């Protein structure tokens, strides 16, 4: 059977017994192929009543898996074929780099790393519990021929290990002995055909090793320390996209999360936008912003599919991007993996998950430390909540609260000048119902560029009986006097004329007649247009964290930032490569961190939207 070798590989790693009653298990595979080992491991996890809460599977592949070959390869195994059919749709549109795919309610996380084996290993920032090693000359034909496995590849593997990590190689791997031994692995061999697998099945496993170096393990290259900490209680300040996504990611990992907001209901600020677009940023040099948005959009669409009602709360319509800022003749871009989405509905869905409690009308004015816990205080000094960790996800309000905290507790060493500069930017959306105009007036899909038009959005519970269109959005720093609604409407109409001249002409009468509604709020934007995610103080186990500054890209960034924060709390594989993760560091203004970024060739300068 096709799964025999993979099941044997699982057995030689001591699984599923080794992960029994663990919070999480982390597996690294050096050659994904068509996913046989992943599917077999996932099946074993599903079938085990004592499975860990989280299964992390990181796999390197030279190219995205071929969906037809993946399904054909599992045809002889009905159980694996069912799982392959869940995997296949998420393999659409994979590109070079890290791709995070989620299954079983976010409890099975597959991180596919598409690219050169050694480069992908060096971009990791976690310690695996098990490693499936399959050398393949095609991974790097000029350097890693099976007969000459290079020591630096073994070193890259060692960097992904903790003491006790088990490694198995389901091939003839004699040529790996010297390099792996030199890097701290203690090896044993298994003769091909020896019955060690399930039900005494023959096996082709030829190498088994355990990482147990004679020296003290030091990980000086770990610039984003990922030390797993005991699951406990957490308070999140802010119930918008940033706060709700953090709460959902932590609750899936067993945290008890209290979300506090000064408003009576969630998504009362900029996250209350009636509708937004989930679409990646594109740049000629594939800058940091583009790469981050690609990863974030994939994660967000996975959340929408699992939590929201398609056609009512969101729809995967695709989005047409007009290249209005380019030279004449630059073609438009069609984004098939893009959607419109109602942020408020997503926030509510996140906050409805088990382990999360929402507390409205709760303005946090100060914090007080009591032993290992933090007390969140209201304006009168009364305690709103107590938790072992606090996440500031309250947009622009975070900086004012941090100023107060630093003044009260100077020993915390929270230097506000190390955080990216944040400012509020007002935005107004113009919208109206589909009345008085034929349906063919509107494009069948959203269009974005310098602004956006979302033409078909249901605004009731009748799934399309009452439809509205939305055009936006204006962009004005809150340091300036607010512009009147009429001026912002005119700005939005001018943008619409550029995006879709025909539609702009058709809707001009509604704007002129004052038959257009306005929705407005203030975004929180960082100077470099990237969110701020990370600890606020430099200690071994920081209790204060930030996840803020999403700007106009909350739908692209929020789930990515939440998963990045949760991964760092839990010692998990990161959803993006370590180089990209460093660009989001909350304290990225610190001198030591700035110097490290300046030396890194992996981090091109971010580009503005």
From Swiss-Prot:
Names of required cofactors: FAD
Pfam families the UniProt entry points to: DAO, Methyltransf_30
SUPFAM superfamilies in the cross-refs: FAD/NAD(P)-binding domain
GO molecular function: oxidoreductase activity, acting on the CH-NH group of donors; tRNA (5-methylaminomethyl-2-thiouridylate)(34)-methyltransferase activity
Taxonomic superkingdom: Bacteria
Entry EC number(s): 2.1.1.61, 1.5.-.-
Coiled-coil blocks: none
Residues covered by region (tRNA (mnm(5)s(2)U34)-methyltransferase): 1-229
Annotated region (FAD-dependent cmnm(5)s(2)U34 oxidoreductase), positions in chain: 237-609
Protein's UniProt keywords contain Cytoplasm: yes
GO CC terms, sorted: cytoplasm
InterPro entries attached to this UniProt entry: FAD-dep_OxRdtase (IPR006076), FAD/NAD-bd_sf (IPR036188), MnmC-like_methylTransf (IPR008471), SAM-dependent_MTases_sf (IPR029063)
Keywords annotated in UniProt: Cytoplasm, FAD, Flavoprotein, Methyltransferase, Multifunctional enzyme, Oxidoreductase, S-adenosyl-L-methionine, Transferase, tRNA processing
Family: In the N-terminal section; belongs to the methyltransferase superfamily. tRNA (mnm(5)s(2)U34)-methyltransferase family.
Protein's job: Catalyzes the last two steps in the biosynthesis of 5-methylaminomethyl-2-thiouridine (mnm(5)s(2)U) at the wobble position (U34) in tRNA. Catalyzes the FAD-dependent demodification of cmnm(5)s(2)U34 to nm(5)s(2)U34, followed by the transfer of a methyl group from S-adenosyl-L-methionine to nm(5)s(2)U34, to form mnm(5)s(2)U34.
The protein's name in its UniProt record: tRNA 5-methylaminomethyl-2-thiouridine biosynthesis bifunctional protein MnmC
Gene name, Swiss-Prot/TrEMBL: mnmC
